[in-house]
Amino acid sequence: MAAKIFPVVKFATKVTIAGGALYVAYDSGLLGGSNEGSVALARAKSAIPPAVDEWMKYFGFELPATPKIEFSPLDAWNSGVQKSIHALSVAPSTVGDYTKQGLQYVKDLSK
């Protein structure tokens, strides 16, 4: 009997955890628009450092200082996305050009 109930309990536990995570994400504004996401990020940035300090005092060890970066990861991410999308948008014409060059090369070889 327990062997038949265990998979159901296991599945129910997984569904409950996933549903709870989805509820928390929706409630905190992570699944909304970019404005709601920005507000949620600002709340997280203001809440995380005090929590880390509290846990460091509780456990008695100290984390190293976060390194300062000279560039914005957001800009780097956006430029990478823009380059990728640009490469995908010009891919059909580029493939056509390479095909023409390849056919011309084969024609020149056969002469």
Curated annotation (Swiss-Prot):
Source organism per UniProt: Danio rerio (Zebrafish)
Listed InterPro entries: Mic13
Name by which UniProt lists this protein: MICOS complex subunit MIC13
Function text: Component of the MICOS complex, a large protein complex of the mitochondrial inner membrane that plays crucial roles in the maintenance of crista junctions, inner membrane architecture, and formation of contact sites to the outer membrane. Constituent of mature MICOS complex, it is required for the formation of cristae junction (CJ) and maintenance of cristae morphology. Required for the incorporation of MIC10 into the MICOS complex.
Transmembrane spans: 8-26
Keywords: Membrane, Mitochondrion, Mitochondrion inner membrane, Transmembrane, Transmembrane helix
Family (UniProt): Belongs to the MICOS complex subunit Mic13 family.
Protein's membrane topology: Single-pass membrane protein
Locations listed in the record: Mitochondrion inner membrane
One Pfam entry name: QIL1
Entries under PANTHER family matching the protein: MICOS COMPLEX SUBUNIT MIC13
Assembly: Component of the mitochondrial contact site and cristae organizing system (MICOS) complex.
